[in-house]
């Protein structure tokens, strides 16, 4: 053999291609929120090695490149690949169509989507941009099926780096992202004009930041987990401000919970548009699958667990649990109602004769709450002194301590402010919720007085608080009994007597004084109140003057109009009787009479409305009463635990059931009598049909500021000439208390 022939044989041997062993690995679906592991050999591709070492020769040889060919390759599983192929896998430009409708079209490199490309989902969602090693990585734009759009940088299928997201509801975020969450500095603009600029951590506002409302209100300071915490300043549009070191339990948390209706609620969603943590999705959602070809003999396959439209909306928008802190707390107040129910009262807008009075009241309460918020000490006996009152002047141009305003010059008086601040704390009324419900952008509603006192009633738009104008004599009674009242409500947390939150007085320059008290609204409820009764236990004049056809849900009915008795569980019935006895003894000791039990009834059976001529029963959230779909609840005893379970289903939260609020009961239809013998005999009235209704009750003792003075004594003497002395309201407090308790024990019945 010649030397040239030997050289040719060696050259041929050195050009032998040594193929790598292809080991097929099990596909690994990565769920949202898990760490993405990229390890050598996770998916081993059949590919040529550019440089190999010959074992026999010990020298490095170059591998002959595999040529590119264009193919249309149907796969056994129904998928289809069209494009360039090299070495048994996609390489170059190509299109892969999955049988479920997903499609990738773009660049491939050694079996992996790499370079520029576009991925489409059957739902209409798309990603167009850069890919690397089978993943969305680099710069790209994701458009969700619902219209959400993210444009920015990606790392391993996640938003990471700088990017901007436009939400389908009109919201917008631009800033830094980390693992699909806002993290670092960013700006979020709500569709209603609210804007936050500042720091984020793990998808939640945390750090230094500024939140600005369209009306000019603003908060600038420190945040933690979506709420103000630390040093910060809340500034109103009129220039007044509140400065302090805020924490979760004090005023600033509720500055933001209290303005959710107009300011921070995002669309009609239960969750914010703001992206959040990658919580567990219960094993139902999967991470976008990796676009990598796995060669197995003649066949090939690309794993396609790409998200569909539902998953896209979950993964790219709504992963937040509503129970976590942060902006998810800015949801609708349970007392709001957006349905078709008639809201009582007339909104006090500009031009209303009480408009200036409302502005004065709002300015005064805002000033009072802010002024006394920083005072931290125990109450002293002098704090209860009726002379403990403070006058403050509010000129339109403002002073060092009062803001400028558009109303008339007026003076403002606060009675025993530290005592009422402590009472609000006792009744768990957050200072800022209190302030913003009364002093926020929403106007108050004026109600006509259902009684003969001539008082005016004002209701906040969220229905949480009631404001009543009162006489000077009533203010004196309240201030006189304030020490005993404070002791009583401290001792009995389930007391049914009216919850007082403040006593104030407004006097315009050259005008008359208007005294008013602020109270809790008994009927602040998630449920519509279809019947309301004002019950004293007397009969003389105790019926409504309205004809039957004009009675609606806003009508306050009286004793002779009552045509129900209410059945309570044994433990609730016993607690009610005990508390009524305690409250009546307290009022009797204070020489108070002429009070009432105000009762509100929500009928849970959707058929009750047709029988009683009521409008359709709607939850105060505006939805049709979902209890109609819960047949298993009907006919049972409606134990409080069951009611709580149902409300968790309906509203996503556990309701607060206490004596006088959210109480499950049964209402038995009784015959309405024109006389009062049904109550004077000591027994219950006779049922007309024995009809039973499942209800939720709200009740409390109201009008507790009337003492048995000379006026009431004269009224008693005069009316005794016309009617049975035992049937009139104006009687001695001791007799009134006994009659009231006997009456309550007859209309409320222990469930056997």
Swiss-Prot record:
Keywords: ATP-binding, Kinase, Nucleotide-binding, Phosphoprotein, Repeat, Stress response, Transferase. Expressed in the whole plant, preferentially in roots. Strongly expressed in meristematic tissues, namely procambial cell layers. MORN repeats lie at residues 81-103, 104-126, 127-149, 150-172, 173-195, 196-218, 219-241. GO terms for biological process: phosphatidylinositol metabolic process. It catalyses: a 1,2-diacyl-sn-glycero-3-phospho-(1D-myo-inositol 4-phosphate) + ATP = a 1,2-diacyl-sn-glycero-3-phospho-(1D-myo-inositol-4,5-bisphosphate) + ADP + H(+). Residues 708-729 are annotated as: Activation loop. PANTHER family: PHOSPHATIDYLINOSITOL 4-PHOSPHATE 5-KINASE 1 (PTHR23086:SF98), PHOSPHATIDYLINOSITOL-4-PHOSPHATE 5-KINASE (PTHR23086). This is Phosphatidylinositol 4-phosphate 5-kinase 1.
